[in-house]
Structures are given as C-alpha cells and as structure tokens.
UniProtKB/Swiss-Prot annotation:
Source organism phylogeny: Eukaryota, Metazoa, Ecdysozoa, Arthropoda, Hexapoda
Positions contributing to ATP binding: A253, G293, T294, G295, K296, T297, L298
Region spans: Disordered: 114-154
Any one GO cellular component localisation term in the record: chromosome
UniProt-recorded name of the protein: Fidgetin-like protein 1
Species assigned in the record: Drosophila melanogaster
Cofactor(s) this protein requires: Mg(2+)
Key word Metal-binding present: yes
Protein's UniProt keywords contain Hydrolase: yes
Amino acid sequence: MSDEQSSWRSKLLLICQQTRSSSESIHFAALKDHHARLQACESMEKAMKERCQKKITMSRRTKRGITHAGYLFEMPHNSVFEPECRGFYESCQQTEMASSDLQAPALEVSSTYPVQQAVKSRPEGQFPESRNNSTKKIDAQQYSSESSSQSGFGFRTAREQLIMDELKKKNRQATSEVDAVPTGMMNFRKKTLGGKRTVSSNFVSPVAQNDNSTSSRSSSIPPALAHLDSKMVDHILGESMHDFKPVAWEDIAGLESAKSTFLEAIIMPLRRPDLFTGVRCPPRGVLLFGPPGTGKTLIAKSIASQAKAKFFSINPSSLTSKWVGDAEKLVKTLFAVAAAHQPAIIFIDEVDSLLSKRSANENESTLRLKNEFLIHLDGAASNEEIRVLVIGATNRPQELDEAVRRRFVRRLYVPLPTREARQKIIEKLIHQVKHNLDVRQVIELAELTDGYSGADVDTLCRYASMAPLRSLTPDQMEVIETHQLPAVTMDDFKQALRVISKSVSSEDCKQFEAWNEIYGVRH
C-alpha cells in the first residue's frame, strides 16, 4: 500500500471514529463526502499523468525535429487541477488532517477560519443585498443552498472567501453581518469538553452570552458613560439613584440660619451656575454634623428638591466588592454617572464609616478605596464646569480623616430643634389625626420635650396617636369606622412622655458644640 493510500485510509478511520456517536445520516454523509474527495483526487492524478505524458511526447518529437504546424495546446479546465475545496481536504497541497484538528471545537478556531464568527446570528441563506446596481449581484440564497450541501468542517474555502470579499465590498454598511455563514453547513465535529487547544484558538467563555440583553442594556447608558463598565453603571444607578418625594423648606422646622446658608452657597449656584463662576465658584463639599435624628438626611433631600438635581444616596455597601480593585472602579463610576446627570447631589450618610481616619494597620483595599474617593472628591471640587455637590452627614465628626475634613469646605452644625421648632413639628404631625389639643397645650408639649431631637418628637407623636386604637377591643376594631375613632388628648401625650425618652445626652451636645467652635462654620 502506498503512502497516499495509507493517508486516505487514516483520514477515513478518523472520520469514522469522530462520527461513531452521531446519527446514521451524519455518518453516511461524512463517508460519502470522503469518497467523493478520494474520487476527485484520483481523477486529478490521472489528468496530471496524461498531461505529463503529452509533454514528454512533445519534447521527444521536438528533439527529433518532428513538428506539427496545426497543433494547438488547449489548457485543461481549472476543475481538473483545482477541484472544489471541501474544507481541510486540499489534494493539490497534500495537507494531512491530524486527530487534534478533529478534536478542536469548530467555533473556537475563529482567527484561522473566521467564517464561523456569526454562524448563529443569521438564519440560513440570508445575506445583505447589495445596493450597487452597476456591479453584478451575487445570489446569496443560491450560495447558501450550495454551501449547505458541503460538509463544512468549520473551514472557509477559497471560493467562500472570494464570495465573502465581494459581499463586503458591496455592503460597506453591514460588514459586521457579512461574516455570517449559513447554519445549514454540516459540521461533523463531536463536541468535547476541554478539547485540545491550538495556536489559533481563541478563548470561549463558559457562560452563554446574551447579545440582546447586552445591547438593550448598553443602549440605555448615556454616551458619556460608554467607556465605563456597563455592569458597574447599572449597579450605581440601581443602588444609589433614587426618586423621592420633593421636600420643601417648610417641611424642615427651625434651622433658619442654616437654610440661608444652604440657599446662598448651594441651591442658587446649582440653579444658576452662570452667575457663580471664578472666585464666586461655590463649594462642592458640604458636611452636615450633629446629633442623630436632627434631620440631616431631610436637609439633603430638600436641597436636591430645591436645586432640581438628581439625588444619589451612597452607603458603604454600594461601593464595596469582594473583587480586588472593583471598589475603586465603583467610586470612579459613581462620580462619572453623577457628572453625566448633573446637576447632581451625592449624599453619603454616616460618612465616618466610609472615610474615617487612615492608619498603618488598615486593610489595603479599604485604604485604596479612601484614597480613590479623596481624589475624585477633590477633582469634583476643582472642576468648575461639573455641577456635582457632595454632602456628607455624620454624628461622629471627630472620626473623620483630616484630608476629608479639608475637602468638605462647608461644615454645618445641625443642632437639636429649639422650642419653636419642636412646636412646629408637633403641630404638623397631630394635624394628620383627630385631636382636641389647643395652642396652649401644644406649647406645653414643646417645653416638656426639651432635649428631644426631631426624630424623638416624631416618635412621641406617633406613640400618642396610637392611644385611641389601644383603647379598643379587637372586636370593636373590626367594625369601627375611621371617623368614629376617639380624639387624641393631652393625657395621651403625657402617657407617651413616660414611655418615650430623649436619645441625645447633654454631654454629646457639648462635644458637637466644641468641634463646631474649632472646625465648623459660624452662622
């Protein structure tokens, strides 16, 4: 047996081995294709031998001086020398097929055989039509039907490459879709897990990719954020960006001096940035500190409502990740998203837990997160064109890092509500329920709640308003109407005062006042 016959026999054995677990139709088609290639190779060899014999005969006659005046050599048809290529069987080059090539997944060899780039992206036989009427159009459907009859081991033949090049020239606007091939091409490869990789193999993700969801998600992202990770942008928009009910200044009792400062330094610059430029550039970092429950978060929402700005509420969990380096990227994405939706307000509640004092024993990832936040916070304050305000709220200003304290230019103290402020809070809350309190009793309640924070007064009023419901039995509560409920009385509030106590001590207030004397803004 010659070497060529041994080679063809080895190919036949490899095909039988790879298709033994496939259906009978696929197995029969593979054997039939192999036989056709063998016949084409034998016919080509026969033609080559005949041509060589004619050349030898002509050379001998020339040497003997025998010529034929009317002899005209006719070039055989190209199909004699170049039979239609069927994948990896190119008889003219005598290329051998190795077992590793049969084991490699067909879709992974994208750089060598780019015809498989978009096998699943287009139905069979649908190619973009050419708009150039001056050139000859190629019937894509006919090409699809011809290609579907080929065996197609995932390779691109010279004829296929020529047709693809012509389609690309005629369809400049659809070059991304031209690489698609008909799905009808037969693929005899047996799918394996962890097949042998070759030099030309590309990485294939083990997770199936959904192109439709990715494109729809990326289309909702503004063009200014196209350079960022779409997943991080969605995370910031989903976790931090909130739509809340607008809060007016009248909803905040007291703090008249602080309101004037907010209006001058924050609200008007955000609404009229053309007036506040150069030296008049407003501060972009504001720190609200004071006892808990004094309305620091409510003030931030009111500022966002008055300035007609987007409100981003940040907590430490929104900027942390188990992957190294992702926390810094989330901080960068946060400021980029806020700049894209300007005017915007980034509110960081309990900022001391995120930007506390740095130490040598601190975790490296936490330290990098703080440094990245400080860099962007300083950048937001130095760029006059970006209307992004960063508001931090804390009840432990002593724990803040010195660099953070410097970047929060305006440090405003939010104290406990005064007697007039507590009176307004009580009047606003009891107005929602049926009561029989007069102005004198409301003033008395405001004096009895000295040292209470705004949250404490709110809790007191809610507890007192539940007294009429507590006086009812379960059976009465089932049948009673809303207008039949008893009114809230002064005795109900006195009972609530015995249950609800203040949550802020006088020592805590002295510490806040001392820190305000050193670092705070004096109204």
